[in-house]
From Swiss-Prot:
Its main location: secreted. Residues 1-24 form the signal peptide. Belongs to the plant cysteine rich small secretory peptide family. Epidermal patterning factor subfamily. InterPro entries: EPFL. It comes from Arabidopsis thaliana (Mouse-ear cress). This is EPIDERMAL PATTERNING FACTOR-like protein 3. It comes from the Eukaryota.
């Protein structure tokens, strides 16, 4: 009896997932194929740029393409975020989180 309960519970857990995922692959098989073949690295980057990008510590800068409303070059800059919550313990007293913004450099 216990075995039958486990079998039925697995069936009712897995079956809806198969039903949910299945039609997406049937309707758009070419989209799934494109996603699996998509290159992670930009083919125009040279090896030095790839190594430099991989060695960067922390978060990645955002893509600032079409975010500066016409100025060139639009570049990502890092800035410290200002927290309204006071530090609750001395362990985080020196911690300053940083964020990214897209910015036009001065001419």
């Amino acid at each position: 009896m216990e075995y039958m309960f486990l079998l039925m519970s697995k069936f009712f857990f897995v079956f809806p997932i198969i039903i949910y995922i299945g039609p997406a692959e049937i309707i758009k098989p070419q989209a799934a194929e494109e996603n699996s073949r998509r290159r992670i690295l930009n083919p125009n980057e040279n090896k030095e740029e790839i190594v430099k990008r991989r060695r960067r510590i922390g978060s990645k800068p955002p893509s600032c393409e079409k975010k500066c409303y016409g100025c060139e070059p639009c570049e990502a800059i890092q800035f410290p975020t200002i927290s309204s919550i006071p530090h609750l313990s001395p362990h985080y007293a020196n911690y300053q989180p940083e964020g990214w913004r897209c910015h036009c450099p001065p001419p």
